[in-house]
Amino acid sequence: MILCVPGPHPLLAEEKIQRLSLRGIAEDLTEHIMQPLPVPAFPEEPAPTFAAPEPDGSAPQTRDPEEDLLCIAKTFSYLRESGWYWGSITASEAKQHLQKMPEGTFLVRDSTHPSYLFTLSVKTNRGPTNVRIEYADSKFRLDSNYLSKPRILAFPDVVSLIQHYVTSCTTESKSEAPYPPPAPLPPVQKEVAVAAVHLKLLRPLGRRDSIPSLQHLCRLRINRCTTEVERLPLPRRMGDYLKQYPFQL
């Protein structure tokens, strides 16, 4: 690009005449038009007085960090007792463990993303996939987009979250009621439905290097039979052991 800048040169006679005439017109307009107008006197009105807002007595609520620490520590304790928490394995390792498993087999591992604590790895009809588990306000939920997040259920710990979806998937698979044929979808929604991956949580994949104890297996069996453990005629020590892991998985 070439930038052209006009240099200094003598003005022609016609240009000088035009500039002088324009200057005279501007001065004439200034003398006749640009005159200050008299301002009429108006009675002064008192400025309105506004009452200062009273400070609100309720201080903004701040979360106690100790509450988050207790919630996360309790979740880690439950996961270690579960037998299907695989710790700090990578996504590739989780894929290898789930590749030959039936659909619905899952495990929980540490997330490699710095903003998340845990990740759910599950075998789907298209192969193993991973879903991050989000933590906020002492609650855990499956990670989702911004629009779907208000409809995602939140739970006080990860094992409660997993057990909820396992129970719902098991109930759906055992249901024998025929479903009506779905209505045809628009082209855009049909493409989204085809691209979507359906998750089924049916059975956890236990660690091969950690065989569950007979006590833990009995505890699972009792939890599957009743949710009112405190009413069972058991010794206090055994009742406390059952309360340490009140889940069915």
UniProtKB/Swiss-Prot annotation:
SMART domains: SH2 (SM00252), SOCS (SM00253), SOCS_box (SM00969)
Cross-referenced InterPro entries: CIS_SH2, SH2, SH2_dom_sf, SOCS_box, SOCS_box-like_dom_sf
UniProt GO BP: cytokine-mediated signaling pathway; intracellular signal transduction; negative regulation of receptor signaling pathway via JAK-STAT; protein ubiquitination
Positions of the UniProt region annotated as Disordered: 41-64
Record pathway: Protein modification; protein ubiquitination
UniProt GO MF annotations: cytokine receptor binding
SH2 domain mapped to chain residues: 84-165
Positions of the SOCS box domain: 200-248
UniProt keyword list: Growth regulation, SH2 domain, Signal transduction inhibitor, Ubl conjugation pathway
Domain observations: The SOCS box domain mediates the interaction with the Elongin BC complex, an adapter module in different E3 ubiquitin ligase complexes.
Task performed by this protein: SOCS family proteins form part of a classical negative feedback system that regulates cytokine signal transduction. CIS is involved in the negative regulation of cytokines that signal through the JAK-STAT5 pathway such as erythropoietin, prolactin and interleukin 3 (IL3) receptor. Inhibits STAT5 trans-activation by suppressing its tyrosine phosphorylation. May be a substrate-recognition component of a SCF-like ECS (Elongin BC-CUL2/5-SOCS-box protein) E3 ubiquitin-protein ligase complex which mediates the ubiquitination and subsequent proteasomal degradation of target proteins.
Record-given protein name: Cytokine-inducible SH2-containing protein
